[in-house]
């Protein structure tokens, strides 16, 4: 006989492994764990001990005339104590429920008592897993009892099936928890009986309900039933809580097919097997037992011992399917089916599998699907790939892949502009809404009332070709000598002047005529009311004259032509008018609408007539402005002054600017600290059409920026910071955008030489003009690169940057301190200063030429014919030659021609005439010539002697130039 293990014996006895091990150790049998084996004698001893422990005695006690209490006592007092207390409590609670019924059939329970006392205890051990109980299941709170005792009570129920259902629920109440006993009597077993009993006849079903006869019979079995119920295990009682009418019916059908003898307590199965027992009992009693059987039914593998409160039963019944476990209280129906949950263990894992079945479920993409109403993203001027991916709710790697497919390599932190973001969003079916800082709402322009408008001086811009007399004309009008202060005699700044005339005040803007100052001229045309186009009578229409005409037409500004230098002998006014007519400026005397006046700025003739025409044109325009509103203007010029800091020349267009006003200018904001007129006079306020120099700027603004005054300094600072962020994002997206094509071009450009420059200028306008001109100098061979530029003097950081990047520092109209020059000498940095722009551009061109590879030109200086060869020891082959033409020089380049084919190209190593070394031999003489590292000279070869002349390289024209 094979040995039995502890866990097998525990299963047979329906005990927990630990409890059984404790009992075994008390018997003196040594075991280690539940896998330990037991000898046959040990098993027999254990079984005998349990059999003796289960010996029962039944006590009967008459409580009243119609009530008899039977108490089943175990030999072990402690195991029988709990059921006894339960019985007493059950009996006392059952009395009020059954008190109305007569006590006639008291004898019937006596028939039940005999089978209970006669049952051997071994029978309960033989069937440890009986799923059915005769006791009713309405109460969830049942005390735990040993499996053997439960089995014994199940077999004893057969005669007790006559017990009415009213007392049985009370008998099942767990004595350890009296507060939960109250709901038991409230239930109505007779109603359940009528719906669930199958084996009882219809008349027997109807009899027990109206008849009070079963009252006493019900109480007697209730006592015995209480004793039996106390022996049931907690697991069985907890399963009783789960019992439902539907489930009870289905499970009973299954159990009938199995014919398990331990389940004879179910009257529907017991009736055909033991008819003699049922014949003794009245039909109405049998019917009531079926009701209790239905309530006690549905027993499965034992689960948690803690019962569910009654108030949760209804909710649990709706949520659970049959046979499901209590673990379903963890609601995961959103992600998993109930079958998946039922297949999981207590830790949420598949049974027999350590992997979590739902580990990958929470990452389902459909859970994070963006709603249709939210498929719109907001993008400013630029946005990083990471922020765009976050708004779209997709991975940034997906956007990077899409950018690669579009030919735009990018990383997660790279900024893309609005158009690229819109293209990306459309690929993922998103809409893009361009949003920005709503400056328009904060900077709303108030409409002027007619009564608030007053006349303002006209703004006149003087334009024309370089050296045609623009500044000389202004000097004549202002009675000053501005041109004397300009380097090189040409205007390199845009100047603003307020001139008071007898017939009215006028504001003049003097723009440069040099080709480098195109942006200045365009800026002047945008802020002006009238343009005076100066044309030299001796030169006629030139390149910048045509450009000025186009700027004025683009700004839709009326033009008055001043034909200067009419006092010169070679002046030709008619030719000038004819050339202007070719460009759309028809003189009034020719039927056009353009006023043309001949003047001489040096002799100051025609000036008054010109001013009259200007004021007449201004009256026709009816120029008005409101001085009572916040000031708005335009930056004409800006610079960084060493003593005063950033200084900007502002032309007030409307409103009045006062000292202390809060301003916003581009990305700068602050308060106006001081104001000065064009003549250097301090001003407290400036009205419309008045140019002023403003101090107190937080930085050097760009020429052409709007100058606006605001009531709140915090608001101005917020707008300025927002503009700065937008500017940085825009520059970042422009500089960091690298396409596959541009990447290939950069690889090819590795051989292109690059001239690095650091540019510092006095004013922003000059800086802008020089920057544009320098960038236009780039050629396919040499590229001009401005690694840094700004306004102000050359400082130490500029020198250090130039040293690190191998750059040249250029200062325009600025100088540096002595220590800066010493640092430049120490670092071997070339620092150059200029006052005239064309000198600067010329030197930069020369520097670019110096970076080109030298060009050599080949000049043939002589030819000699080999007529005889000589072998000289330690020297080699010597060619006795006759100089046919030119001359032969020692160390000159030489080619050996044989049959007009170059055999060797080398150098003449020795040259002799007779026995003397010669420096050169001219034509018509014979000489001996030795060719370096070449001895295969033959008679008839021609020696061609040449020299390489180094030529100055020439820069190719920049792309686009003609």
UniProtKB/Swiss-Prot annotation:
Residues 455-624 form the tr-type G domain. Residues 156-173 have a biased composition (Low complexity). GO terms for cellular component: cytosol. Residues 564-567 are annotated as: G4. Residues 122-263, 293-327, 341-362 are annotated as: Disordered. It is found in: Cytoplasm. Signal peptide: none annotated. Residues 244-256 have a biased composition (Basic residues). One of its GO terms (molecular function) is GTP binding. Residues 600-602 are annotated as: G5. One of the essential components for the initiation of protein synthesis. Protects formylmethionyl-tRNA from spontaneous hydrolysis and promotes its binding to the 30S ribosomal subunits. Also involved in the hydrolysis of GTP during the formation of the 70S ribosomal complex. This is Translation initiation factor IF-2. It comes from Syntrophobacter fumaroxidans (strain DSM 10017 / MPOB). The gene is infB.
